[in-house]
Amino acid sequence: MEDRRCDVLFPCSSSVDPRLTEFHGVDNSAQPTTSSEEKPRSKKKKKEREARYAFQTRSQVDILDDGYRWRKYGQKAVKNNPFPRSYYKCTEEGCRVKKQVQRQWGDEGVVVTTYQGVHTHAVDKPSDNFHHILTQMHIFPPFCLKE
């Protein structure tokens, strides 16, 4: 077998040990590219997150009737909280609203419901059915999530 020694291209650095710049069997026929010849990186658009709204409601049941229909798609344990968090999606076709439901850690009588997105359809049930829930809700400003 032929012993071919080729130099490995390193960024401009004079402090590289010459013994590290040689490898056996490496083809060095490709020409190095300069920074002006490199392909520009495509800038990916950052996905904008929809606003989130959190509500605290004093209730003995976790699933509150808010007038929409929901499908549960997950549940997970949360650190430092004995109560799991449940994940729901709106069942209306084309509606991308999600909600998370979890009991508050210090006060298990409080249910925290976080909504993400805005419904693209009318409410399924009249609002007078859950007037008592609305009177108990504490509305918080949208979360500012940083990536």
Curated annotation (Swiss-Prot):
Which molecular function terms from Gene Ontology are attached?
A: DNA-binding transcription factor activity; metal ion binding; transcription cis-regulatory region binding
Name any GO cellular component annotation: nucleus
Q: Where in the cell is it found?
A: Nucleus
Which UniProt keywords are present, listed alphabetically? DNA-binding, Metal-binding, Nucleus, Transcription, Transcription regulation, Zinc
State the residue spans of region: Disordered.
21-52
Pfam families (UniProt xref): WRKY
Q: Which PROSITE patterns match?
A: WRKY (PS50811)
Provide the binding site for Zn(2+): C90, C95, H119, H121
> Annotated DNA-binding ranges?
59-124
> Would the keyword DNA-binding turn up in this protein's UniProt record?
yes
Check the record and name the InterPro entries matching this protein: WRKY_dom, WRKY_dom_sf, WRKY_plant
Instruction: Give start-end of the signal peptide.
Output: none
* A GO biological process held by the record: phosphate ion transport
Protein purpose: Transcription factor. Interacts specifically with the W box (5'-(T)TGAC[CT]-3'), a frequently occurring elicitor-responsive cis-acting element.
Q: In which family does this protein belong, per the annotation?
A: Belongs to the WRKY group I family.
Protein name, please? Probable WRKY transcription factor 45
Organism from which the protein derives: Arabidopsis thaliana
- Taxonomic path: Eukaryota, Viridiplantae, Streptophyta, Embryophyta, Tracheophyta
